[in-house]
Design a protein with these regions (language model features):
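Extracytoplasmic
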Residues: 61, 80-82, 89, 96, ...
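Short, exposed beta-strand "edge-strand" segments with a Pro/Gly-rich flavor and a Y/T-containing core
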Residues: 51-53, 82-89, 157-164, 231-233, ...
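Amphipathic heptad-repeat alpha-helical coiled-coil "stalk/arm" segments that mediate oligomerization
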Residues: 64, 68, 74-80, 85, ...
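Intrinsically disordered, low-complexity
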Residues: 2-71, 92-95, 99-204, 301
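Peptidoglycan cell-wall recognition and remodeling modules
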Residues: 180-301
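Short, highly charged low-complexity linear segments
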Residues: 84-86, 119, 124-128, 152-163, ...
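Residue-level marker of structural boundaries
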Residues: 75, 103-104, 230, 284
Length: 301
């Protein structure tokens, strides 16, 4: 068979670089999701520990009250058997005999019930904190794992690009740079988000970044909509569900365009068949044709 020519070699290199960037983007979105979950779990742990601390303060106050009641009886010359049970290690037996106590004893019984309820709350809250901490550790490991995957894919892509002649590298990284003349956006907030994305043109791609000086793909769209007062989820997979899905043929400026079956890349439609997006490391925020990758969905926020 005939030897592959330079064009075939460049096409093969482009396919391999595209594959590596695609895999790196998928890993980046998994990294973003794991990092967001880590933040959520950290907040859960903090809230659980705060609830446990407040409950413990209540327990301490009730124990002080019970101790004062026992001390008063001791100074009066006798300790009621009910108090002995109250301060024993088996409060359930006290509750079983609470019906035999006098009114003062009933007050102590009610206090003991509160004490036992607070103790259960502390145990439950500490268990919740322990569960959240275990999840936090798992997600920290996932963050580190996805980070290693991204770095490996990007390093391989950089090595492949570095091995190509300069003109081939330029051809692989060619992108549209002229702003399209767009029809009207779907809403004022979409207009504001698109304006923000345009202000980000030329800023660098940094995986895991969400502005204002650098972005990954979902970080750009999240930041742009935040400038319009709209809170979007962090990952491209979540963002594709952040509004109403419309056909690509009906895309309006400001719509989110998700790519590949796993929605591992996302861009903002800018009109006239163009999108603004953060492509990959080494390529700044820029315009590209909407069909640069297989489109999986278009979402109107």
């Amino acid at each position: 068979p005939a030897a592959a020519g330079p064009r075939d070699g460049r096409a093969g290199a482009k396919a391999e670089v595209d594959r590596l960037y695609g895999e790196a983007e998928a890993a980046t979105e998994r990294y973003n999701a794991a990092r967001e979950n880590t933040r959520r779990l950290r907040a859960e742990v903090d809230r659980a520990q705060d609830r446990a601390a407040r409950a413990q303060e209540g327990v301490n106050r009730m124990r002080d009250t019970l101790g004062s009641m026992a001390g008063a009886q001791y100074r009066s010359g006798a300790i009621d058997p009910s108090v002995q049970l109250l301060l024993s290690s088996d409060p359930d037996s006290y509750l079983e005999r609470a019906a035999f106590l006098d009114r003062e004893g009933e007050r102590r019984a009610a206090l003991l019930r509160k004490l036992r309820g607070a103790a259960r709350t502390i145990a439950r809250t500490r268990a919740e904190a322990g569960h959240a901490l275990a999840g936090l550790e798992r997600d920290r490991e996932a963050v580190a794992r996805h980070k290693r995957t991204v770095e490996d894919k990007l390093a391989r892509a950089r090595r492949l690009l570095a091995s190509l002649p300069a003109e081939d590298r330029a051809a692989l990284d060619h992108a549209a740079s002229d702003a399209p003349s767009a029809p009207g956006a779907a809403s004022p907030r979409a207009t504001a988000a698109l304006d923000a994305a345009r202000r980000a043109l030329g800023r660098p791609y940094v995986w895991g970044a969400n502005g204002p000086t650098a972005f990954d793909c979902s970080g750009l769209t999240q930041w742009a909509y935040a400038q319009a007062g709209v809170s979007l989820p962090r990952t491209s997979q979540e963002q594709r569900h952040a509004g109403r899905v419309v056909p690509l043929s009906q895309a309006r400026p400001g719509d989110l365009v998700a790519y590949r079956a796993d929605a591992s890349h996302i861009a903002m439609y800018a009109g006239n068949g163009q999108v603004i997006h953060a492509p990959h490391p080494g390529a700044p925020v820029r315009y590209d044709p909407v069909g640069m990758l297989p489109v999986s969905s278009v979402t109107r926020v």
